[in-house]
Amino acid sequence: MDKKLKVIVSGGGTGGHIFPAISIADAIKAAKPNSEILFVGAEGRMEMTRVPAAGYDIIGLPICGFDRKNPFKNIVVLFKLMRSQIKAKKIIRKFKPDVVVGVGGYASGPTLRMAGKLGI
């Protein structure tokens, strides 16, 4: 029997990121039915409803984009980025993926950075 493939798919924000991510997950499941897939997205964004509707688990990061109109609000963004990196690292350590795939969107950055730092 094949070893269970564990995959994190990270990203979202728009349908242009989410639906290709779900297609990637579906293709992995078709090729390796016993694989385990976990999505990592941005809290409060579209992926938090679309991914579970497609049958996959998702964990949200407290990440958001920069505010171009009010640069002072970006101080909060930096703290959210740090918190997101810490949370992404914890998710990766707990899930122990074989591979991490980024599809774009706010959540991809911290997740891929931490995966790289952890040697994945």
Can you say where each PLM-predicted feature lies in the sequence?
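Residue-level detector of alpha-helix initiation sites
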Residues: G13-G15, G105-A107
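Redox-cofactor binding/interface segments in oxidoreductases and associated redox assembly factors
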Residues: V9, V101-G102
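Short helix-capping segments at alpha-helix termini
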Residues: K29-N34, K117-G119
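Glycosyltransferases and closely related glycan-assembly transferases
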Residues: K89-V100, G109-I120
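Short alpha-helical
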Residues: R45-M46, Y106-G109
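Conserved nucleotide-sugar phosphate-binding/catalytic loop shared by glycosyltransferases and other
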Residues: K4-T14, A31-K80, Q85, K89
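Short amphipathic alpha-helix
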Residues: H17-I28
